[in-house]
Amino acid sequence: MERLLIVNADDFGLSKGQNYGIIEACRNGIVTSTTALVNGQAIDHAVQLSRDEPSLAIGMHFVLTMGKPLTAMPGLTRDGVLGKWIWQLAEEDALPLEEITQELASQYLRFIELFGRKPTHLDSHHHVHMFPQIFPIVARFAAEEGIALRIDRQPLSNAGDLPANLRSSQGFSSAFYGEEISEALFLQVLDDASHRGDPSLEVMCHPAFIDNTIRQSAYCFPRLTELEVLTSASLKYAIAERGYRLGSYLDV
């Protein structure tokens, strides 16, 4: 049985090094999809590069943890900036859900202004869309707009019912991440999904060239290792050998 494999590179627009890495991993590797941060410092650069790479499917990386929001979010920002304190607010059940709903719509419209089309799908920076309080908002929005949504089904039991017309891959893996990146790790992710019987799988990745912005990230040099693995000719062969077809959320 042929299975669908979506290799999605997060953080398009984070920095020029990130952008170049994603384009390289698409052009000469197995990355088929990316998600863009519309408030990223290099988003205009990402838009420019994407024009020369029409085969790259582009979704939206909803941001609630970094940079400046597009709308006024006094309930989530500090000194006008988003940050990781969102976890504390979630634990205290103090998330400003109306502000988050408005910000989602604004980022979505900004994406369309930048790229001239709808995103192929939605996910989020640091997976915040999987918070039980936020997931229903994002799931409903994706279903209404007719676009797919990244779903990590492990914490989904706390996220409520899915809209009937919501599209997603059957499987999702964030395991291709960390200090031990290798071709063997990527293939283990595929084998695990095959054993579960998932007919479609998204694998998250972060290929990048190192620049000053990436150097400031807690996840730095493994991004370059990811790029090396994702552009390996032997990996593409091994994927096909396992019965996977490379595609995007447009195929879901």
Curated annotation (Swiss-Prot):
Catalysed reactions, as listed in the record: N,N'-diacetylchitobiose + H2O = N-acetyl-beta-D-glucosaminyl-(1->4)-D-glucosamine + acetate; diacetylchitobiose-6'-phosphate + H2O = N'-monoacetylchitobiose-6'-phosphate + acetate
Keywords for this protein: Carbohydrate metabolism, Chitin degradation, Cytoplasm, Hydrolase, Magnesium, Metal-binding, Polysaccharide degradation
Obligatory cofactor(s): Mg(2+)
GO cellular component: cytoplasm
Keyword Nucleus recorded: no
CDD domains: YdjC_EF3048_like (cd10803)
GO molecular function: chitin disaccharide deacetylase activity; deacetylase activity; metal ion binding
EC identifiers of the protein: 3.5.1.105
Main location: cytoplasm
Record family assignment: Belongs to the YdjC deacetylase family. ChbG subfamily.
Biological role stated in the UniProt entry: Involved in the degradation of chitin. ChbG is essential for growth on the acetylated chitooligosaccharides chitobiose and chitotriose but is dispensable for growth on cellobiose and chitosan dimer, the deacetylated form of chitobiose. Deacetylation of chitobiose-6-P and chitotriose-6-P is necessary for both the activation of the chb promoter by the regulatory protein ChbR and the hydrolysis of phosphorylated beta-glucosides by the phospho-beta-glucosidase ChbF.
PANTHER family, sorted: CARBOHYDRATE DEACETYLASE (PTHR31609:SF1), YDJC DEACETYLASE FAMILY MEMBER (PTHR31609)
Assembly description: Homodimer.
Protein's recorded name: Chitooligosaccharide deacetylase
